[in-house]
Amino acid sequence: MHIESPIKRRQSTRIYVGNVPIGDGAPIAVQSMTNTLTTDVAATVAQINALQKVGADIVRVSVPTMDAAEAFKLIKQQVSVPLVADIHFDYRIALKVAEYGVDCLRINPGNIGNEQRIRSVVDCARDNNIPIRIGVNGGSLEKDIQAKYKEPTAEALLESAMRHVDILDRMNFDQFKVSVKASDVFLAVDSYRLLAKQIVQPLHLGITEAGGARAGSVKSAVGLGLLLSEGIGDTLRISLAADPIEEIKVGFDILKSLRIRSRGINFIACPTCSRQEFDVIATVNELEQRLEDLITPMDVSLIGCVVNGPGEAEVSHMGIAGSYRKSAFYEDGIRQKERFDNDNIVDKLEARIRAKAAMLSKENQIDINQID
């Protein structure tokens, strides 16, 4: 059942990336980044649409050349999810994609150039009502900051960020968010904690270059979990050396585990032992695949025996407590007369979950429409 998160979020200003609100209490936005060649318009559009299908609120696209900028124009015309253009080295690319309707510009202080170039980007962003992300990265700090600190430190990342925040402040430009990413969990966490005390703008969270699907997910969950539990963060990206689809799934799983934002089914499943009366692992894996299209938040417990099965089912939207041959079925915490054959749990439970999700979605829509 739904339990409110005890987390009190950091107060920040509000910006919009396309039609997606960021900060000031808005839902924490989950984003990913394409890994196709941007000049391959068809492949990039296909990947963006696939990311949107699994819940991406925002998608970032690398724009390394003017040819990529021209491709970005065509891409933007074919997708509906807000796009962030990732700009490094050549500030003129930012000016070009601004003409093509980009929803946000990500610039890297470590390589975008001098203050005059930054001012050109800011002026263009203001004229076109485009927000900016100041994206600091521990692996690409400015040379003078590298020389000063010798190695990436939280203070070094903070100095880089504040240097560019100050430029935007002097230009009276407040439509921006900031990130201070590092591949080390403690370095990233310390950097964000320092930054959160210095500015009121929204913060984009991430553990950069976190690694492969398994290790990177764990590293991201630890780092972002610490920050989110402290109320820090307004948007996030999980950086994995894996299919970008996994980044969105992991991002929502982290938010779901902290009760911050839910999307789809939250499966509560036991790790199994010799007491299990049905194949829990196979059941969970099959249901996760079959039901990944659902977006209605629901808790479903799948426990293989009667030790913890009834207790978990009583606090879930639906639950199975394993029993000999036929397992007990619960809905809204109440044990039902119907029992599920242990060899046919997946099919029957899928049908019940889909029906329940449709009902909850309809009820939620009615509640929204009744709000003045």
From Swiss-Prot:
Binds 1 [4Fe-4S] cluster. It catalyses: (2E)-4-hydroxy-3-methylbut-2-enyl diphosphate + oxidized [flavodoxin] + H2O + 2 H(+) = 2-C-methyl-D-erythritol 2,4-cyclic diphosphate + reduced [flavodoxin]. It comes from the Bacteria. GO terms for biological process: isopentenyl diphosphate biosynthetic process, methylerythritol 4-phosphate pathway; terpenoid biosynthetic process. Its cofactor is [4Fe-4S] cluster. Pathway: Isoprenoid biosynthesis; isopentenyl diphosphate biosynthesis via DXP pathway; isopentenyl diphosphate from 1-deoxy-D-xylulose 5-phosphate: step 5/6. [4Fe-4S] cluster binds at C270, C273, C305, E312. InterPro entries: Dihydropteroate_synth-like_sf, Enolase-like_C_sf, IspG_bac, IspG_bac-typ, NO2/SO3_Rdtase_4Fe4S_sf. One of its GO terms (molecular function) is 4 iron, 4 sulfur cluster binding. Keywords: 4Fe-4S, Iron, Iron-sulfur, Isoprene biosynthesis, Metal-binding, Oxidoreductase. Its EC number is 1.17.7.3. SUPFAM superfamilies: Enolase C-terminal domain-like, Nitrite and sulphite reductase 4Fe-4S domain-like. Converts 2C-methyl-D-erythritol 2,4-cyclodiphosphate (ME-2,4cPP) into 1-hydroxy-2-methyl-2-(E)-butenyl 4-diphosphate. Belongs to the IspG family. This is 4-hydroxy-3-methylbut-2-en-1-yl diphosphate synthase (flavodoxin). It comes from Aliivibrio salmonicida (strain LFI1238) (Vibrio salmonicida (strain LFI1238)). The gene is ispG.
